Regions:
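N-terminal helix-turn-helix DNA-binding core of bacterial DNA-binding proteins
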Residues: 22-63
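Short amphipathic alpha-helical segments with heptad-repeat character
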Residues: 6-9, 13, 17, 61, ...
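C-terminal regulatory/oligomerization modules of transcriptional regulators
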Residues: 1, 125-150
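N-terminal leader segment of winged-helix/HTH proteins
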Residues: 1-33
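N-terminal positioning helix adjacent to the helix-turn-helix/winged-helix DNA-binding module
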Residues: 4, 37-39, 99, 127
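Charged, amphipathic alpha-helical coiled-coil/dimerization segments
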Residues: 72-133
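Generic structural concept
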Residues: 13-16, 43, 47-50, 97, ...
């Protein structure tokens, strides 16, 4: 059981890194050099929303990257628009610019292509549904475990 548990944890990490590689290769194919794969996923997680940096951090999983630094970079390169929050002038909100929305559309097209290829290999993607159930169960376990510690 211990070996299966450890293998699952390592596989989750490898899959995340592999997906970042997939995103990076798409950015390279599109000759986009002013943004990296993690920043692209930050944009994807923002989507059509307007968020504070704190909300963005809570929504995504960026493997310890500095979300504030990445947001500054994305604003400087025209992917995000940053505005003061109307209710609290100390807080800022970010939303995608037209350039950011265009990149998110390109990433969504990549994801659609991936889904199509996966569906050809295993029609219905039922194996992913089962995998997701297992991952949600593991996430709940770790969340409950951490809440018991504090």
């Amino acid at each position: 059981m211990k070996q299966i548990y450890l293998e699952t944890i390592l596989l989750i990490e490898r899959l995340h890194r592999r997906f970042l590689d997939v995103v990076k290769s798409e950015l390279d194919r599109l000759k986009m050099e002013d943004i990296n794969n993690v920043q692209t996923l930050i944009l994807y997680n923002i989507g059509e929303d307007q968020l504070t940096v704190g909300e963005l951090t809570n929504r995504g999983y960026y493997l310890g990257t500095n979300v504030s630094y990445n947001v500054k970079h994305l604003v400087a390169n025209g992917y995000l628009v940053q505005e003061k929050a109307p209710h609290d002038k100390r807080s800022t909100r970010v939303r995608l610019s037209a350039k950011g929305l265009e990149l998110v559309k390109m990433l969504d097209a990549l994801i659609e292509r991936n889904v199509g290829e996966l569906d050809k290999r295993n029609p219905g993607l039922s194996h992913l549904l089962e995998t997701n159930k297992s991952m949600h169960s593991l996430e709940r376990f770790w969340t409950e475990y951490m809440s018991r510690l504090y």
